[in-house]
Amino acid sequence: MAQTFLGQKRLRKYYGKIREVLEMPNLIEVQKSSYDLFLNSGDAPQPLDGEGIMGVFQSVFPIKDFNETSVLEFVKYELEKPKYDVEECMQRDMTYSAPLKVTLRLIVFDVDEDTGAKSVKDIKEQDVFMGDMPLMTPNGTFIVNGTERVIVSQMHRSPGVFFDHDKGKTHSSGKLLFACRIIPYRGSWLDFEFDAKDIVFARIDRRRKLPVTTLLYALGLDQEGIMDAYFKTVSYRLEKKRGWVTPFFPERVRGTRPTYDLIDAASGEVIAEAGKKVTPRAVKKLIEEGSVTDLLVPFDHIVGKFAAKDIINEETGAIYVEAGDELTLEYDKDGDLIGGTVKELIDNGVTNIPVLDIDNINVGPYIRNTMAQDKNMNRETALMDIYRVMRPGEPPTVEAASALFDTLFFDSERYDLSAVGRVKMNMRLDLDAADTQRTLRREDIIACIKALVELRDGKGDIDDIDHLGNRRVRSVGELMENQYRVGLLRMERAIKERMSSVEIDTVMPQDLINAKPAAAAVREFFGSSQLSQFMDQTNPLSEVTHKRRLSALGPGGLTRERAGFEVRDVHPTHYGRMCPIETPEGPNIGLINSLATFARVNKYGFIETPYRVVKGGQVTDEVHYMSATEEMRHTVAQANATLDENGKFVNELVNTRQAGDYTLAPMESVDLIDVSPKQLVSVAASLIPFLENDDANRALMGSNMQRQAVPLLRAEAPLVGTGIEEKVAIDSGAAIQAKRAGIIDQIDAQRIVIRATEDLELGDAGVDIYRMRKFQRSNQNTCINQRPLVKVGQQVSKGEVIADGPSTDMGELALGKNVVVAFMPWNGYNYEDSILISERIARDDVFTSIHIEEFEVAARDTKLGPEEITRDIPNVGEEALRNLDEAGIVYIGAEVQPGDILVGKITPKGESPMTPEEKLLRAIFGEKASDVRDTSLRVKPGDYGTVVEVRVFNRHGVDKDERALQIEREEVERLARDRDDELAILDRNIYARLKSLILGKTAVKGPKGIKPGSEITEELLETLTRGQWWMLALEGEQDAQIVEALNEQYELQKRALDARFEDKVEKVRRGDDLPPGVMKMVKVFIAVKRKLQPGDKMAGRHGNKGVISKVVPMEDMPFLADGTPVDFCLNPLGVPSRMNVGQILETHMGWAARGLGLNVDEALQEYRRSGDLTPVRDAMKHAYGEDVYAEGISGMDEDTLVEAAGNVTRGVPIATPVFDGAKEADVNDALTRAGFDTSGQSVLFDGRTGEQFARPVTVGIKYLLKLHHLVDDKIHARSTGPYSLVTQQPLGGKAQFGGQRFGEMEVWALEAYGAAYTLQEMLTVKSDDVAGRTKVYESIVKGEDNFEAGIPESFNVLVKEVRGLGLNMELLDAEVEE
């Protein structure tokens, strides 16, 4: 691969051994493709039938009015251009969305009174505005009211049919009761279940159960039809009073002991004697010979069988037996036959009786028994029964019942299986219905019951509902589609009513439609759905992970309380689809998961993972994506199976997975092999080096804590990485990539201007301007700041990283810092995972981060008059106003502390009635400062920092103050600068093309002084201004046309640029849309640098976390033999019990990387002294090894090599991919090459005494993160603050400026000490004794020290509660009694 500019800057030594044939897919593909499909925009594939906005409109329209004289049809829809771009929406607290325009057609019919025939009377088409449709930003998020939100994908049970049993829990006998459930995408659920007596019942929507035959009758089957559907028929033929002749099935007698002799009906010989076991050999012989087809069975053997058909007297129509009736014989005392249905049949000459083939072993009589219990016999009564269950209390009629039953399962408006449901149902029941058949059919219901009965008979298996073939993912697009459908259906009702009530001939479609419900549904979904979440923006990794999250919670999903262990557990089908490691600790464990690195979601919503195809033991490079169901049919080998250089398996037996089991299989039988070892974990887990050496619980914490790492002031990529850091940085959108190749034209901290050299289209200026995000606040108050990595004049290729973002370093994810750590105790300061740090870390800002807080204040129009933002605040001294400008708004750059005023604001307060004197004074001196109170925005306790940005928003038509005008001027200047740059590059490009077109051609005429027919040369052009070049008319017709076209293009682009500029300026100058009642709004952003200090939480990448206990002077820290003091001391006891040995390997590997870097550094110093490059080349070869050197480094020229070497002097970065990284031997080898001992331990000296420690200590380089749990955000103390309204007790929590609860146990402690006065104080004046509180304040002010406690307010609350129960309770004073 061609080394990009950045790759040359810093090479990573790669330890992976397995060649990857497939590049990791884009990490936020899930979000983007799903929403593209919904909007049917971009280059997304065509959606399936009825998907996306189009599908929603098609399913709701056409809308007919109640008497069908008019129809409203949907023609097409179109999304217009969004009014504001992403940036503007974030600044103005708006939603990033595009107006949705729908073309509707209203058709009015004329109905002939007599014939009822319809003829079209009128057709009207019109574009109707249907509200705004939120758009997704390029990074897969949504901007809603100015904040970035993510819609998390939901895992839910796939529609289709599921078979299950109750695990023997329902009935005391422990008998398994089987059940079957048909789950549609939307519509009524249909359940079938057995009870303990083996009767089959059906339930609709979990209501009262009905015998299943009632449902079958309602479907239009009769008794014979039902028997036919579920049982085979055998005939019993009477043989001259000797017995019955019936077909013989040899299989059924295998291993049984017959109760009677089995006699061949044809020959009369006994083929098996009664009471003797029939051996399998005998059965086999009978099957092979095949001579015995019928048996002769005893006469009374027919008793207890059931008739398969109605047997009727053809002439009289009398029914002897009905289908399903039991056949009986009755004998008297002497054993003579006196009655029974069989006698009646024989007497009437029926000697061939069709009987249900039920043997109670292979086939049970469940459906027949159910039918016998069912009191319904026909469709009408069955329908009425169903109606009574569904609509209890309403009088049933046959018509209503029939209509209800039809709409339940067979009406596409009310019931939708969805394409997925239909596919799953066809697969499970072996049906062949078309994918477009989205409702149930009669055959489906019959097949479900049949499969359920077969399960009860012991055929087939129940389904595993946690199998990923039975759970699917609903992504943004689909969730949004469901929500929009709900909105449109609400709208449909209103439209229908309006169509009936208005004069239909005169209205247009616009008059019928009120788009509010649809717009409201969308707004509600994005604003308050459980799945629409505030984006976790702490660092780029947390963004990516949030977008790849899969939640089982949410509407239509599980709830935390109801979810059992099975749902949360890791399932074999998760392999390569969902990460087994990354999930939250706590109540949501296992319910919220992360998509695996290579996984993707297919069109049906099932998660697929890629495999390479294996043919005859030979691994090919062909890659197939498989869903969990497809994978069950294959044998899959692990990615680390040993292959030879041609890709053939080395071992005869290979470790494989087959249908969820792990087996050793011969290499010929292997069909697939994993694409990569990291395909089974998520992005966060695959960022942990040596993950394979960590315990899973700690790996889980490691993955979760990386997401909480705060972006530091200077990012530093890990020395020991895994090789996917670059992928995360780019896909998260933190680093900026070049959209197309070009040359860097100009650059400053705010933007990069690139002159494109490729992908130029006609009418394209060929300029790309990339704006950096400078010190913006993220959702989590961390700082987003981008800085350029390229230089002017440099050539960049498409997709190259041109700017770093937060937590990225040279295009790689960099969440923390590489620091020197020693695993050793130090005076007990690392007890219980505490961390001891050197003062250097705090002094050199190693772990310093910037945090930005946003404060806003709004001036409203109140009943008493408008609030005003001003510098003129009553009773506030000049000192407090020192940071405000004349408009009353704080300066940028002001240092502020708690209590400082940021924005001065006054609010009018109710006028007290004026005395005559005041009236007189006011009449003389004019308007006195009417009563106002100070409601300024002040800095909250615990916040301090520097003001970095101020934004002022004004309502339309409100005069702008000086500050707002100044901000506006700056913004317009910035836009003008952009326009001028684009224009300059456009000029340069166009004139260069013009010059190449006209040089050497002949001019027919031109401006003054040009002779017709003269040749155009460089000299001639220099005598003219560039604008005059266009006046040169060329000789050739074609040439003249080309120049003309170029000129037109130039003018067109200039006009487009100007128009775009004017539009933006207009947006800046126009007033803002503020909430009702708000006249003006000011936002102030304060940034603060937070250094590392005791109480801050830090963590490594292996789940090793701790809190800083002490900052030690650098000279007191333990130091190495060369005098280097260590930066961190960690507790060695934190490793063995937690089994995250990966951190130790990382420490050793980092130490080796640093040693090799120091070697390169020495070689560079030698080169600077002598000018000889050989030592540098040798050092690089030594550091990277022969192969990498030959491939990437040997061909570099001097400057490039020196730059590449200069970038690795702090340490040679390495990549050790998960499950395929450096082994122990590699670590030893690296340590040896760096010149260290393979134990990885060094001799340390005590910084305070200078003495050597008793034994060598493990010292190395470790990558540590500072987490978003900073002590500054947690520390808090209450002085006097707000009280709860009812109980009058102080509030709790930092946000409420609350106190610490003095609880029950603390009271016991004071009681135990007998500290009565302290206790009384705690329970009264320091808590909720309102009168006492004020008295104490007074006495303190007066300097007295005695006070009385009164009655606590909570006691009054108790008294009121008791009175509420109707018991009068009063407090009486003891003295008064006397």
From Swiss-Prot:
A GO MF label: DNA binding
Gene Ontology biological process terms, A to Z: DNA-templated transcription
rRNA processing found in the keyword field: no
Coiled coil: none
Annotated S-S bridges: none
Record's GO cellular component terms: DNA-directed RNA polymerase complex
UniProt xrefs under CDD domains: RNA_pol_B_RPB2
Transmembrane intervals: none
Reactions accelerated catalytically: RNA(n) + a ribonucleoside 5'-triphosphate = RNA(n+1) + diphosphate
Enzyme class: transferase
EC number annotated for this UniProt entry: 2.7.7.6
InterPro entries noted in UniProt: DNA-dir_RNA_pol_bsu_ext_1_sf, DNA-dir_RNA_pol_bsu_external_1, DNA-dir_RNA_pol_su2, DNA-dir_RNAP_su2_dom, DNA-dir_RNAP_su2_hyb_sf, RNA_pol_bsu_bac, RNA_pol_bsu_CS, RNA_pol_bsu_protrusion
Keywords assigned by UniProt, alphabetized: DNA-directed RNA polymerase, Nucleotidyltransferase, Transcription, Transferase
Family stated for the protein in its record: Belongs to the RNA polymerase beta chain family.
Subunit structure: The RNAP catalytic core consists of 2 alpha, 1 beta, 1 beta' and 1 omega subunit. When a sigma factor is associated with the core the holoenzyme is formed, which can initiate transcription.
Function summary: DNA-dependent RNA polymerase catalyzes the transcription of DNA into RNA using the four ribonucleoside triphosphates as substrates.
Name used for this protein in its record: DNA-directed RNA polymerase subunit beta
Organism of origin: Ruegeria pomeroyi (strain ATCC 700808 / DSM 15171 / DSS-3) (Silicibacter pomeroyi)
Organism lineage: Bacteria, Pseudomonadati, Pseudomonadota, Alphaproteobacteria, Rhodobacterales
